[in-house]
Regions:
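Cofactor-binding loop segments of dinucleotide-utilizing enzymes, especially the Rossmann-like FAD-
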Residues: 8, 37, 109, 142-144
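Structural beta-sheet core signal
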Residues: 33-34, 84, 106, 139-141
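Conserved Switch II/interswitch segment of TRAFAC-class P-loop GTPases
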Residues: 87, 101-120
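Conserved C-terminal guanine-recognition region of P-loop GTPase G domains, centered on the G4
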Residues: 118-133
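NTP-binding/hydrolysis catalytic cores, primarily Walker-type P-loop NTPases
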Residues: 186-231
């Protein structure tokens, strides 16, 4: 199964989410590959992880810019799960990744929505459905330690409503990229971590994987759940 993680900004939340999902998935005994559109970034992280003896070990690959569908097809038999940090830019590689993904996870900051970038991302997600009608899109709200406030809630809900058949995660991530947990580590496996942040990542993981087969709920139901969570 291929899961892509994209967003509209070059913010670290996308990479943080991808790495934590990969670690938690590998910990469950699955063969996991973590891919990125940025050459070397996750390879360096994986090398640091290996050097520090951190387990589970994560295989990392670069998506590349050519023959992406062929590359992904070759990797499918080798891994149970492929997680792809697909970046924030509208590239051919990103489009190919979205066309091959079963689920797209979109971390979004309600208080930092750039209108131009927002519509570019929404167009990319809606366009991916033309080639991949069964694609599912899961937005994840990201806020500061005390958020989300009323304006952030409204912005996130409006953002989600503009993507066809998109859903909103019940989990809210509070400043997930605020701390450095050491070379090759993330909050899900750091020796000394923030238990609240780790619990949020675990909750997001549970939403992404445990409920994936039944994620096709109506937008109305999901928006209602989001409102209930944030009251």
């Amino acid at each position: 199964m291929i899961i892509a993680i994209v967003n509209q900004h070059g913010t670290p939340e996308r990479t943080v989410v991808a790495r934590n999902l990969a670690v938690l998935r590998a910990r469950s005994g699955r063969r996991v590959c973590l891919m990125t559109t940025a050459a070397g970034a996750d390879s360096d992280w994986c090398n640091d992880r290996s050097s520090a003896g951190v387990r589970p070990w994560i295989d990392t690959r670069h998506v590349g810019s050519r023959a992406v569908p062929t590359r992904l097809a070759a990797l499918r038999p080798l891994f149970n799960d492929i997680l792809i940090d697909a970046g924030a830019r509208d590239t051919d590689g990103c489009r190919c990744v979205l066309a091959a993904s079963r689920l797209v996870v979109v971390p979004v900051r309600g208080g930092a929505l750039d209108l131009d970038l927002q519509y570019r991302l929404l167009a990319r997600l809606n366009g991916a459905r033309v080639l991949n009608p069964n694609i599912r899109v899961l937005f994840v709200a990201v806020s500061g330690p005390a958020g989300p406030d009323a304006n952030e809630r409204a912005a996130v809900l409006a953002h989600v409503s503009r993507v066809q058949h998109a859903t909103l995660a019940l989990t809210v991530l509070h400043a997930p990229a605020a701390f450095d947990y050491g070379l090759g580590r993330c909050v899900s496996d750091a020796a000394a971590c923030d238990p609240d942040a780790a619990a949020e990542m675990q909750a997001l993981y549970d939403e992404v994987y445990a409920t994936l087969p039944t994620m096709a709920h109506s937008m109305k139901a999901q928006m209602g759940a989001g409102h209930a969570l944030w009251r």
